[in-house]
């Protein structure tokens, strides 16, 4: 008998995450590794857990996640967005709380492109008066 499984896609910067949620004991598997193995930084782990802590589902759901692209921060943000969407599919009544916390909205900020004549996106070459 197939268990009910809920899905959410999350994106942030150049990262995209696919999140599968089902009832369980609180296991979080990211790219075949545990949360602690995958993210060395405590802040990244905290970002991933935020939506679950908000709706008190920390030990009640198992998460299977595949994430690709970007760096640590972008991947953590993409996973958070994906978990939020999967939780909304799991229980629509959670949407209001997740929206209030700002997890439903996709963070649209992207890296600004480098411009010709500048060193970076906005950093100008040093100006010399004489």
Swiss-Prot record:
The answer to keyword Nuclease applying to this record is: no
Question: Which cellular component terms (GO) are annotated to the entry?
Answer: cytosolic small ribosomal subunit
Check the record and name the SUPFAM superfamilies matching this protein.
Answer: Ribosomal protein S5 domain 2-like
Task: List, in alphabetical order, the Gene Ontology terms for molecular function in this entry.
Answer: RNA binding; structural constituent of ribosome
The reply to whether Ligase figures as a keyword in the UniProt entry is no
Q: Which InterPro entries match?
A: Ribosomal_Su5_D2-typ_SF, Ribosomal_uS9, Ribosomal_uS9_bac/plastid, Ribosomal_uS9_CS, Ribsml_uS5_D2-typ_fold_subgr
Gene Ontology annotations of biological process type = translation
Q: Which domain of life is it from?
A: Bacteria
Please give the PROSITE patterns that the UniProt record associates with this protein: RIBOSOMAL_S9
Entry keyword set: Ribonucleoprotein, Ribosomal protein
Among the Pfam families in the record, one is: Ribosomal_S9
Q: Which family does it belong to?
A: Belongs to the universal ribosomal protein uS9 family.
Q: What is this protein called?
A: Small ribosomal subunit protein uS9
Report the source organism: Sodalis glossinidius (strain morsitans)
The root-end lineage is: Bacteria, Pseudomonadati, Pseudomonadota, Gammaproteobacteria, Enterobacterales
